[in-house]
Design a protein with these regions (language model features):
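Conserved catalytic core of nucleotide polymerization and phosphodiester-bond processing enzymes
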Residues: 1-428
């Protein structure tokens, strides 16, 4: 069946949740590592010298490198013999590529490198235009939740930690270096990432522990975690969270500021929060208490228990307080995607912003804070992303707008985008 369907063009539906975040079906580029490795663009683009550099960046990323943008490209170019070894003998080199951060994507990238070399190498030169690439190559937003919070709160120090400006910063390594757990350095950093990412978006300790329990089943990537029970995992998550809070106190400050506003709003009888993102997506946040229903019925063979949940007319205030700050970040995160796909450009100042659009000239796959395009199109994509996130905050001040819409006390933060557009590691 796979052979029959090979190279057939297909389209995938996407839907937006109530915050504006896009989701694709389970079998899609947004799916597993294997899914992502086998889905390609239907139309190809001729390779370029700059596109080759971005393919090197993509290959380094899926291999698992964590370094400065230019350093990753340079290191990746020094590994060409390894990439050829993997692509020429995937079975014999299984021990190499199976330990990559994204094994199947790494294998696919190695095959792309091999095919380009075979097609384009002419003596000591490369004639890149001879190769037509269909491979989606990815740019990830570095520490996206922390970037948004740094912009919301106008905190340049958090901006530096999350790679919005200055030299390369590895937030996860910075936290990992302060932990006392005896895990290997690479695993310690991975543990921190698996805590910091969901925590940045507002996940509870219990949710994070459950996710860690799933991840620790990976024998190659969680050797230390596999030795921990629930209580020990809980202690580890608490330690990681406290270190993050100590070096990024603005995150807790932002959540507290939002919680105070929500408390006042709920105290006045509100049952729903409504706000618009800069791209005019209207968020409706409504949390009601749930009545759980159970009933036992005969299925024809056995007695089975049916369970259902029905909302009742009582506001779930605790959920509003805990979920609003993360949902603000999620909605602003979604606005970056909407603005990019709309290819928006802005003029005017805060409160008097004009938005115009032109058709995007190349295909893009978006998965929340990850953006994929043909390698030759990544330089333009990267430039657009930096302008988008800079423009959203300097032309709109979306958090101030949120405060106005929900009845909070507005604060002018005078956010400058100069340092954002100069960043080379915000998307890499």
């Amino acid at each position: 069946e796979a052979t029959r369907l090979k190279e057939n063009v297909f389209y995938q539906r996407a839907y937006a949740d109530y915050r504006g975040r896009f989701y694709l079906p389970s079998f899609s580029y947004a799916g597993s590592d294997l899914n992502r490795a086998i889905v390609e663009f239907a139309d190809g683009v001729p390779m370029t010298q700059e596109g080759w550099d971005y393919l090197m960046l993509h290959t380094a990323n899926v291999y698992g490198d964590n370094a400065d943008f230019e350093e990753k490209i340079s290191t990746s170019k020094s590994r060409l013999s390894l990439y050829l070894q993997v692509s020429n003998d995937p079975v014999g080199s299984f021990e190499i590529w199976s330990k990559a951060d994204k094994p199947f994507c790494f294998l696919r990238a190695c095959c792309e490198v091999r095919n380009i070399i075979r097609t384009c190498k002419n003596g000591d030169k490369f004639e890149f235009e001879r190769f037509v690439s269909h491979l989606p190559c990815e740019l990830d937003q570095s520490n996206s939740a922390y970037q948004h919070i740094s912009l919301i709160m106008n905190d340049e120090e958090l901006g530096k930690l999350s790679n919005l400006q200055g030299e390369y910063s590895d937030l996860y390594k910075t936290v990992a270096d302060k932990l006392h757990c005896p895990a290997e350095k690479w695993e310690k950093r991975k543990i921190v990432k698996n805590v910091a990412v969901p925590w940045g978006y507002g996940a509870s300790d219990v949710t994070i522990i459950r996710q860690l329990r799933e991840w620790k089943n990976n024998e190659n990537k969680a050797q230390y975690l596999r030795s921990l029970n629930w209580e020990e995992l809980s202690e580890l998550v608490t330690e990681v969270r406290r270190v993050i809070e100590s070096i990024a106190p603005t995150v807790a400050k932002f959540r507290k500021e939002v919680s105070v506003v929500i408390g006042k709003r709920l105290g006045k009888g509100a049952s729903e929060l409504i706000w618009q993102t800069p791209m005019m997506f209207e968020v409706h946040q409504r949390f009601m208490k749930i009545k759980k229903l159970k009933a036992k019925v005969f299925s024809g063979h056995d007695i089975v228990e049916l369970r259902a949940e029905r909302p009742i007319n009582e506001v779930e205030k605790r959920k509003h307080r805990s979920a609003t700050a993360p949902n603000i970040v999620h909605s602003f995160d979604a606005a970056v995607v909407h603005s990019l796909l709309w290819n928006a450009s802005y003029s005017g100042g805060t409160g008097n912003t004009q938005v115009s659009r032109t058709p995007l000239s190349f295909p893009v796959v978006t998965i929340h804070d990850a953006f994929s395009a043909h390698a030759p199109n990544l330089p333009e994509l990267r430039s657009k992303l930096l302008k988008v996130i800079g423009g959203l905050y300097t032309h709109f001040d979306p958090f101030n707008n949120w405060l106005m819409l929900v009845g909070g006390e507005q604060q002018s933060r005078q956010i400058s985008s100069d340092w954002i557009e100069k960043s080379k590691n915000a998307f890499s």
